[in-house]
């Protein structure tokens, strides 16, 4: 019974994230905590990328709002760190260089090479015309600004 309830609130929050409704997301903090409790542990998490609300937050078309929603989920609500991959996939799909840069600068040093490889794969799957140029811009050029 609880999984049906979690599924319903997850779909609702997912839509809020896609639509970029940051203030509405903040009002739903208790429900976010319930979703977090229901997320499988790292290694047991076999969900699809699109099944995570951090994907939806990162996929938001307003890139500045996407960054703020990401920060809210991970820094304020304590969203599980093993779900960062889902956010990276959403950011790659929406071509959000600012969020990709933020995520990259926040991952552990030993995870950066794997992150770049995964990012390149995701960009290729979304038919990005030149993943390498985008990655160089997102990860290195934005740091110079």
Give, region by region, the residue ranges found by the protein language model.
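Ankyrin repeat (ANK) tandem alpha-helical domains that serve as protein-protein interaction scaffolds
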Residues: 1-145
């Amino acid at each position: 019974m609880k999984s049906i309830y979690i599924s319903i609130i997850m779909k609702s929050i997912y839509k809020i994230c896609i639509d970029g409704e940051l203030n509405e997301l903040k009002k739903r903090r208790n429900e976010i905590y319930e979703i977090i409790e229901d997320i499988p542990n790292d290694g047991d998490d076999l969900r699809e990328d699109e099944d995570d609300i951090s994907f939806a937050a990162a996929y938001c078309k307003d890139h500045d709002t996407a960054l703020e929603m990401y920060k809210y989920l991970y820094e304020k609500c304590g969203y599980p760190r093993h779900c960062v991959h889902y956010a990276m996939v959403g950011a790659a799909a929406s071509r959000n260089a600012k969020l990709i840069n933020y995520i990259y600068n926040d991952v552990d040093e030993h995870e950066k090479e794997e992150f770049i490889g995964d990012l390149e794969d995701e960009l290729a799957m979304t038919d990005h015309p030149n993943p390498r140029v985008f990655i160089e811009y997102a990860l290195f050029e934005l740091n110079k600004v």
